[in-house]
Amino acid sequence: MQFNYSMKNIPMSSTVQAYMKKMLNQGENFLRRANWAAFFAMNKHITQSTLETFGFKNPNAPPFVKEFEEFKKAFLEMIRNIKFTHTGNDFQTQLKSDTFKIKHTPEIIVPADKTRNWYKVPIGDHKKLLEEAVTKEYKRCDQEDIDKVNEETAKIAHTLQLHDRMEKFTVRDAYITLKDHKPNFPSRISTRLINPAKTDLGIVSHRILQELNSEIVSQTKTNQWRSTKSVIGWFNRIKSTARTTFIKFDIENFYPSISRELLVKALDWASGFCKISDRNRGIILQARKTFLFIEGKPWTKKNTVNHFDIPMGSWDGAECCELIGLFMLSKLTQKIFKPDEVGIYRDDGLGTVRGPGRVAERKRKDISELFKEYGLSITSDTNLTATDYLDVYFNLEDKSYRPFRKPNDHPQYIHKLSNHPKNIIKQLPKMIAYRLSVLSSTEKIFKEASDIYINALRASGYTDSDLDDFRYTPPDPNKKKRRQRCRRVIWFNPPFDLSVETDIGHKFLALVGRSFPKGHPLHSTLNRNTVKISYCTMNNMKSHIDQHNKSILNPRTVEANNNGCNCIRSRKAECPLDGKCLQDSIVYQADIIPSDPNNNLGTKTYYGCTGRPFKKRYYDHKNALSNRDSSKQTTLSKHIWELKDKNVEHRIKWSIKARAATYKGGARYCNLCLSEKLTILMADQESTLNSRSEILGKCRHKWKYCLGSIKIN
């Protein structure tokens, strides 16, 4: 399946509702942070918790702050009144057409591993390829194994006081990419297995390992590279002679080759530079207990102890590899190299050798034996006067370096007409030119390398006038970073879309200035310097393919969500939802209609949502409507009891307003709750019984996925 553009291009929103959902989600996140900031500003006697949260959000709704309420109401009204316009262009028409084709393709659309190709694979063939990849390295395990690991993780979460924020092990099915760069493709298909299932403890482990690695690098001064820029700095410091050559090595299957014993040895070694508490060590090792899922069924890695694994894409996988890299660098610099002669980036190493070819060959064998001693195997090249490393090509003979791309790897960039914020479109040529400048040792090399990138930009709709800023900008090593005040900023990140007519940025900043002028109690906390806006984006083309694949692999059939009605035959006519009372995952609507049409009260509407079959939620409402002790359970029951006290005859008509999926572990938000909140926001405020304060309410569907819901023995 061919796409002649970057999959990072973004089509315009297919529906207004899709945009408004994301806007409301981003707006809710902003309001929560701003509301908490306002609460602590108005209650200075309450000290903010010094608890380390590792980025996990507080699930609770923020408290009421009188001074913040007017801004909150105006902000939600701003979102409600966003205007849209009909717009488009030829490129957006093409994206819309391709999105439609993707959505209606019956096959799985699988990406290539190292190229930009995409392949349609029938469901049966995809299942076979996936099973072959999984059974090669994994074996089946039981749900009890996952429950045990979750219970162990829950104990740690309780000690961190984050049990109400951290979630159980996420159940996400593994997927594959096709290695179409391998020989004999497609007659012989090789795949790469990707495991997206993660543990939240990996986020904690990520922070611990990141700080640990930084401390080790600071003390040892070893060349643990984290960027191309640091490799170039090392290259420029090389004092090369006529006999200086490169030696390059690559650790094969680095992630899966790391054993528990090797990680423990690396931690023991690291403890000599920085104290590693028993708690932190336990967190790192507990985060290694990993599972893989196919159709929701768990698998665990073969030949490992206690489910140990470091899957690619895990929260702390890269940091684990960096720690192992630092450990191996220490061994290399003790036995084979001087500290300034070798460095490593993840699984790629690069060093220099002075002397004849036999010296380099001996070092190659020594490196291979050293890594083999720790259960790792490498491939290596020696006696190189020039070589590629990461995205740079280094030449020792003339001490030059230039940008490097693999053969047939042509760059692709977002189109000028993509649904991206204008500043990103405008700055892209300048950003690419600066990157090429960093990767080029001279202006001449920059100009020689520029053609392929300029042509790629032109293919993406950029004109010559757009490329005026595409020029060589040599990095200044003596340039000092501008000192910036460490100010706590609360960001609002609304989604950008070309179809939006309203100038959201202008209206938002004007609202902040108008709501919190000088003299306002919250001005020092919420002002134009502490509250800022930066646009996020809608789903790109790759996201649309991912969503398509999920819908094919995990079909939610109509029957699964349309279980009909189980009311007894003689009372079918009284079914509250017209024969659909067993439907789940819905936003429902209750219209309270006075029996007397001349009644001045008029029809009132209540909106709610349920992830359970509607009938169970209906019985909860029915109990509240017949039991005065439960009259304040919802605004619906409160209103009904007010009507009863006034002897107003009425009837309730139930209906389905929207359908949406309930929250799943690891998701960014609950689609069902968000649909309910959007319905409340857009409802007529005169006739609805719901309050907009419900928009900041806590999701009721997340708790069962939290570690706090586990009973610890």
Predicted region positions:
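Non-catalytic, polymerase-adjacent accessory regions of viral genome-replication enzymes
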Residues: 1-187, 466-476, 481-497, 501-515
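Amphipathic alpha-helical blocks
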Residues: 139-180, 218-230, 248, 257-261, ...
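Conserved pre-motif C helix in the palm subdomain of viral-like polymerases
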Residues: 171-218, 252-256, 304-334
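GIY-YIG nuclease signature motif recognition
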Residues: 177, 205-208, 250, 313, ...
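Conserved polymerase palm-domain catalytic core
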Residues: 239-366, 370, 381-389, 397
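Polymerase palm active-site segment centered on the conserved acidic dipeptide of motif C
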Residues: 276-280, 343-344, 351-430, 447, ...
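Conserved short loop/helix modules at catalytic or binding sites
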Residues: 389, 611-665
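Boundary/linker segments flanking structured domains
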Residues: 435, 439-582, 643-713
